[in-house]
Regions:
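Short, conserved catalytic or adaptor-binding loops enriched in Gly and charged residues
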Residues: 1, 63-64, 162-165
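Helix-to-loop junction immediately C-terminal to a conserved catalytic motif
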Residues: 1-25
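Short polybasic/polar patches that bind polyanions
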Residues: 2, 66, 120
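Short gly/ser/thr-rich secondary-structure transition/capping motifs
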Residues: 2-8, 69-73, 154-155
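A broad, low-specificity signal marking well-ordered, structured residues that form hydrophobic/aromatic
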Residues: 6, 19, 47-48, 88, ...
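Residues that form or immediately flank small-molecule/cofactor binding pockets and catalytic motifs
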Residues: 13, 54, 176-178
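Catalytic core of membrane glycerolipid acyltransferases/transacylases, capturing the structured
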Residues: 16-78, 84, 95-110
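Non-catalytic C-terminal accessory region of glycerolipid acyltransferases
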Residues: 80-225
Length: 225
C-alpha cells in the first residue's frame, strides 16, 4: 500500500480453519481494511467483520456490508459464522476505543466479554492483531470533554478527527490463543488483552509520535515478529 507503506507480518500464524481475530481500533481503521485485503489476496480467504449497529442505519451501507462481508446482528450470528469454518474479526473497544484512546494506545474495552464467549461457544482460537502507528495516521479530538459527553449521551459516531498522514503502518499477527474448554469468558478476555498489549509494547514506541511515524517510512529496520 504506497500511501502508508503498509506491511503485514505473521500471516502464517493465522490457522487454516476458523478463528476469531481481535484487534486494536484506531481512530480510522484503515489498517484493518488493508489487512482483510491482503488476507484475501494472499490466501483467497474472506474475513467477516463485526461492525457497529449505527452503520447499518446509513443509506446504502448494507450493500457495502454484503461485500465485506459484515456482521451486526449479535452473538448467535457470529457463532454460526465461525462454526461454518470462517474467520471473523472484532474490535472489543469499538467506537469508544477509536475516539477516546490516544497516543498511548490504551485498550478501552470496559466490561465487554461477548467476543470471548463467542470464541468459547464456537470452540475456536483467538488471533490477536495490532498495527504499529495506526493512531498516528488519524487522531480525534476525544480529549475534549464535550465530545466524550456527546458520545456517551447520544452514541452517535460524530466525533471530529484530523490526519491523513502517510505514516508507516505495520500490522502484526500474534500467536493464536487456543480454544480451552475450561476457561471462562472473563479469563479469556484478560488473556486476549495481554496478548495485544504485548504486541503493542514490542512493536510500538510509546507515546506515539506523528513525526516519528512519518520518518519510519524511510527506515527499513523493524522489530522481529
Amino acid at each position: 500500500m504506497p500511501f502508508t507503506g503498509y506491511e503485514l507480518h505473521g500471516m502464517e500464524k493465522i490457522p487454516e480453519g476458523p478463528g476469531l481475530i481481535v484487534y486494536y481500533h484506531g481512530a480510522l481503521p484503515m489498517d484493518y481494511c488493508y489487512f482483510i485485503c491482503n488476507l484475501y489476496i494472499q490466501t483467497g480467504r474472506l474475513c467477516y467483520s463485526v461492525v457497529d449497529h449505527f452503520f447499518s442505519k446509513l443509506p446504502g451501507i448494507e450493500l457495502l456490508f454484503n461485500l465485506l462481508p459484515a456482521v451486526h446482528s449479535g452473538r448467535d450470528e457470529s457463532v454460526k459464522i465461525l462454526k461454518k469454518g470462517n474467520l471473523l474479526a472484532v474490535s472489543p473497544g469499538g467506537a469508544r476505543e477509536a475516539f477516546f484512546s490516544d497516543e498511548n494506545y490504551n485498550l478501552l474495552w470496559g466490561n465487554r466479554k461477548g467476543f470471548a464467549q463467542v470464541a468459547i461457544d464456537a470452540k475456536v482460537p483467538i488471533i490477536p492483531l495490532f498495527t504499529q502507528n495506526i493512531r498516528e495516521g488519524y487522531r480525534t479530538f476525544g480529549k475534549i470533554g464535550f465530545f466524550r459527553w456527546f458520545y456517551e449521551n447520544s452514541r452517535l459516531l460524530l466525533i471530529p478527527m484530523y490526519g491523513g498522514f502517510p505514516v508507516k503502518l505495520r500490522t502484526y499477527v500474534g500467536d493464536p490463543i487456543p480454544y480451552d474448554p475450561n476457561i471462562t469468558a472473563t479469563e479469556l478476555v484478560e488473556k486476549t488483552k495481554i496478548a495485544i498489549e504485548k504486541l503493542r509494547d514490542r512493536h510500538q514506541k510509546l507515546p506515539g509520535s506523528i513525526l516519528r511515524a512519518l520518518l519510519e517510512r524511510f527506515d527499513n529496520h523493524q522489530k522481529e515478529d
